[in-house]
Amino acid sequence: MQAFYLDSEVWSSFDFTRQPSSVILSAEVLAYLDDVDETKRKYFSSTHTWMPIISKMRLNRLTDSAVGKTRVDIALLLLCMKLVPDGVAEDENKPSDLYLTAKQLCATLERNCLLTLRSLQANLLLAVYEVGHAIYPAAALTVGCCVRQGVALGLHNKDAPQLGGNVRSWVDWEERQRG
């Protein structure tokens, strides 16, 4: 990851996205991912109608190909997709367990230098949840994190070095524009 910030030309020859992640999903995270199809259905019929930042076609492809072996960034995205439509806490003075789990996994990915378009999308959904539930100053900090992730991924300028690699298809391009 440091190579990107020190010399983006060296970085562009290194395929970071295919490197294995050392992050192992906890049993708690896996328990929340029990029904991926239901999570996707609820998200795309609710939140996606007013905030279309995730490609349904791409997400279906990623989740279908990862049966039994979900990547951590996709797991975080699915947690946050579940959080926004279902995110009402039983006790409004205490954050939901799902929110705390998503927030913890987000911090784990950041500590392990795992920055992808999926993790940015998850953070955007996390920010929506925090703003909607008036969780301040966490909401402001998450929005700032989203901005920094977008800049690091090169989404702010098409001529900027692209941490996420080159765009391979129209779906990639469209999703980056919406992210």
Swiss-Prot record:
Gene designation: BOA15
Keyword NAD included in the entry's annotation: no
Residues passing through the membrane, by range: none
GO biological process entries: DNA-templated transcription
Domain of life: Eukaryota
Function as written in the Swiss-Prot or TrEMBL entry: Transcription factor that probably coregulates the gene clusters that mediates the biosynthesis of botcinin acid and its botcinin derivatives, acetate-derived polyketides that contribute to virulence when combined with the sesquiterpene botrydial. Botcinin acid and its derivatives have been shown to induce chlorosis and necrosis during host plant infection, but also have antifungal activities.
Lineage: Eukaryota, Fungi, Dikarya, Ascomycota, Pezizomycotina
Localization (cell): Nucleus
One GO molecular-function entry: DNA binding
Keyword Nucleus appears in the UniProt entry: yes
GO CC annotation: nucleus
Any Pfam family the entry gives: Fungal_trans
Protein name: Transcription factor BOA15
Predominant location category: nucleus
Keyword vocabulary terms for this entry: Nucleus, Transcription, Transcription regulation, Virulence
Organism for this UniProt entry: Botryotinia fuckeliana (strain B05.10) (Noble rot fungus)
